[in-house]
């Protein structure tokens, strides 16, 4: 019951118009078919009268045939017009839908613009950039500190390896920690022993100086 008093939308009106146009097109097609049938009958009647030599009857029937063919031609023109109207209706419907979509989009954009504060948005972006820079600086400082720690550890290990290598070259055996190593005086081989191993006095002296032994 409520649908009887419901206001028709544009889509409803266009749908009804298209329905009427389709009905009109079908009626024109039926009318043309009837005219074509009548046209054939007139042609047969004219031929029949011509065979009997009835010229007056042939003349009257020929005039009727001419009028009938003109009417058939008019049906094609009307049918073309109806098709054009149907196409225009579809185009109008599409345009109205696009206009409605644009209107909805405009309202949405307007609502978003009302909610958005350009100054506040700019401030938010600036704060984000500032905090991002702080985070990057903190991350860089942490990385630098870790690099220093690992570099120092690697330098210490490398230095210890060099010391062990030098001590081994001059004949001091390393077992356990450095604190348990024999003293430099006891552990150092004699000059003759060093020479027997092919190490010169200058080389021993240089290596001792490198170890801080005077």
From Swiss-Prot:
Coiled coil ranges: 25-55
Membrane-topology annotation of the record: Peripheral membrane protein
Extent of motif MIT-interacting motif: 202-212
Pfam families, sorted: Snf7
GO biological process: endosome transport via multivesicular body sorting pathway; late endosome to vacuole transport; protein transport
Disulfide bonds: none
Keywords linked to the UniProt accession: Coiled coil, Cytoplasm, Endosome, Membrane, Protein transport, Transport
Subcellular location, record wording: Cytoplasm, Cytosol; Late endosome membrane
Region of interest (Disordered), ranges: 178-200
Predominant place of localization: cytoplasm
GO cellular component: cytosol; ESCRT III complex; late endosome membrane; multivesicular body
Keyword Membrane: yes
Similarity comment text for this entry: Belongs to the SNF7 family.
Subunit organization: Probable core component of the endosomal sorting required for transport complex III (ESCRT-III). ESCRT-III components are thought to multimerize to form a flat lattice on the perimeter membrane of the endosome.
Function: Probable core component of the endosomal sorting required for transport complex III (ESCRT-III) which is involved in multivesicular bodies (MVBs) formation and sorting of endosomal cargo proteins into MVBs. MVBs contain intraluminal vesicles (ILVs) that are generated by invagination and scission from the limiting membrane of the endosome and mostly are delivered to lysosomes enabling degradation of membrane proteins, such as stimulated growth factor receptors, lysosomal enzymes and lipids.
Name used for this protein in its record: Charged multivesicular body protein 2b-B
